[in-house]
Regions:
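Bacterial Sec-dependent N-terminal signal peptides
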Residues: 1-25
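Terminal connector regions
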Residues: 24-29, 34, 130-228
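Surface-exposed coil/turn segments at beta-strand junctions on protein surfaces, enriched
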Residues: 63, 121-123, 136-140
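Short Pro-Gly-centered flexible turn/kink motifs
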Residues: 120-132
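Exposed beta-strand and adjacent loop surfaces of beta-rich binding modules
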Residues: 67, 90-92, 142
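The feature marks short-to-medium sequence segments in extracytoplasmic or secretory-pathway proteins
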Residues: 77-116, 121
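Low-complexity, acidic Ser/Thr/Pro/Gly-rich terminal tails and inter-domain linkers that flank the onset
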Residues: 23-68, 75-81
């Protein structure tokens, strides 16, 4: 009986450690589009108080202790082909720091596989749903979701939540991620952060710098080969 209790305590401790580990370091957003979501009148009426004329409207709600539900509405009168990566929206979570400034508490990890990229068709006035991780901690603040679409940023409503303040620190996971490192190869830390934190036009700037870098490397190789052939 005592042994069983000890094992249970160790298991509880392990689970607690895992949960704490998920809440105390900045990680990449893993939102997942709910393919089984059926738009209801309730889901649509959620947007009734939104007077914004932006082409995309976003409402975030607390689903449970560990999940947010995020509803995304096509607010224009034409079809919206929303960019997706492996059924994930280009979405990260932000929170207000101790000074009241909005800061990212998640980052975006770009896929290296070309097949990962696609789009989600949303008819005019229609709503889709995605779900994203909800954090916990001792720091009471406001959170919101940031969506990047076609080099334009859209924000959800804000919600009062508790997080760990350590989430504001850019973790080693972020710095060691391929998306971050690829930008550093051709540019600097500032642009690397803009890219993984889904700033508008950041990826476009990276793409332009990357093309120039590839052209420079190609030219250097050509000169080297030309020199070797002469020798």
């Amino acid at each position: 009986m005592r042994r069983a209790k000890t094992i249970l305590n160790l298991f509880t401790l392990l689970i607690s450690t895992i949960i704490l580990g998920q809440n105390d370091k900045m990680k990449y957003n893993q939102n997942s589009i709910d393919q089984n979501f059926i738009q209801t009148e309730k889901a649509f009426s959620t947007f009734n108080n939104k007077t914004d004329d932006a082409k995309i409207l976003i409402i975030a709600e607390v689903e449970n202790d560990s999940i947010f539900s995020i509803y995304v509405k096509n607010n224009q009168n034409t079809i919206l082909n929303l960019s997706v990566q492996d059924s994930h929206l280009y979405l990260i979570q932000e929170a207000k720091d101790i000074n009241g400034n909005w800061k990212p508490i998640e980052y975006w990890r770009f896929s290296t596989c070309g097949n990962s990229y696609g789009s989600e068709k949303i008819d005019s006035e229609k709503v889709i749903k995605t779900e994203s991780r909800k954090y916990s901690g001792n720091f009471k603040t406001e959170i919101r979701f940031k969506l990047l679409e076609d080099n334009e940023v859209f924000y959800s409503n804000s919600l009062i939540c508790n997080i760990n303040s350590s989430l504001f620190k850019i973790s080693d996971e972020v710095k060691n991620n391929a998306s971050y490192q690829n930008v550093l190869r051709v540019s600097n830390k500032s642009l690397a952060e803009k890219v993984v934190f889904l700033e508008p036009n950041a990826f476009k700037e990276f793409s332009e710098k990357n093309k120039k870098w590839i052209a420079w490397v190609t030219e250097q190789n050509r000169k080297r080969n030309e020199k070797d052939n002469k020798n």
